[in-house]
């Protein structure tokens, strides 16, 4: 499988997903960062809609994310296509992996980005931080093709309109800019597995399948800047990164771009 580790707040533990093969069941495992000895218990990854095994595809690049409070988030695929429109689930656990918490409604091939509460002015809830993931709704697997990126509250529930499962509440969302109908309203999907968060400008840098790199401004909830990188092709989900000097790094059509002034 294709998964990187995430370290605990203390750096003494790292978390990683494991499976026995492509599209098989899997576990989230905690490991001693010094000795590499497994730390029990491991978590059996379960689809919150079916109550059965979630699956871990080899072509998913999802990696765990550790929140500032130590909670662990990991994206998985559904038990089988297409009970959640191939969106998967963002599973949510405490740091000891002994308690399952509120899941997110999108987890396929995504690594959640942590968003500081202070940079989302419109948020007045009780969580100390928020999460950003892509929130596509694939038209080829039962969805309406209205593909979003979303900021979610990891502790406040809403009812998922597709499955009826209680999931993380969507605080803010931004639909893709380039039409891709039919059906009417469908847009090109967001091609990211994680997003760079810019606390200085209170924004995120996100890649789209339309070949464009966008800045999503959290204050205005608009795509405030953009840079065309390619004509737009179906491609792998890739991350964006911001360097110490403010340069943005993004991959589009298998080319790494450095974007800056």
Language-model regions: role of each:
Residues 1-2, 6-261:
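Extracytoplasmic/lumenal domain signature
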């Amino acid at each position: 499988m294709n998964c990187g580790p995430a370290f605990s707040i203390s750096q003494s533990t790292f978390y990683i997903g494991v499976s026995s093969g492509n599209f098989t069941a899997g576990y989230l495992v905690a490991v001693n960062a010094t000795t590499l000895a497994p730390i029990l218990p491991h978590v059996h990854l379960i689809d919150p809609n079916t109550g059965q095994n979630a699956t871990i595809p080899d072509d998913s690049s999802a990696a765990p994310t550790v929140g500032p409070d130590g909670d662990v988030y990991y994206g998985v695929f559904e038990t089988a296509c297409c009970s959640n429109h191939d969106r998967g689930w963002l599973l949510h656990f405490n740091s000891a992996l002994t308690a399952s918490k509120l899941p997110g409604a999108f987890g396929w091939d995504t690594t959640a980005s942590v968003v500081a509460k202070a940079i989302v002015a419109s948020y007045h809830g009780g969580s100390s931080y928020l999460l950003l993931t892509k929130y596509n709704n694939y038209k080829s697997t039962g969805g309406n093709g209205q593909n979003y990126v979303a900021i979610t509250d990891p502790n406040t529930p809403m009812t998922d309109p597709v499955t009826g499962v209680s999931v993380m509440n969507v605080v803010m969302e931004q639909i893709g800019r380039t039409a891709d109908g039919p059906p009417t309203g469908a847009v090109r999907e967001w091609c990211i597995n994680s997003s760079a968060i810019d606390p200085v400008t209170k924004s995120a840098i996100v890649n789209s399948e339309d070949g464009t790199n966008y800045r999503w401004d959290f204050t205005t909830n608009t795509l405030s800047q953009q840079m065309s990188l390619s004509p737009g092709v179906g491609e792998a989900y890739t991350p964006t990164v911001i360097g110490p000097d403010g340069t943005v790094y993004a991959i589009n059509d298998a080319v790494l771009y450095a974007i800056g002034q």
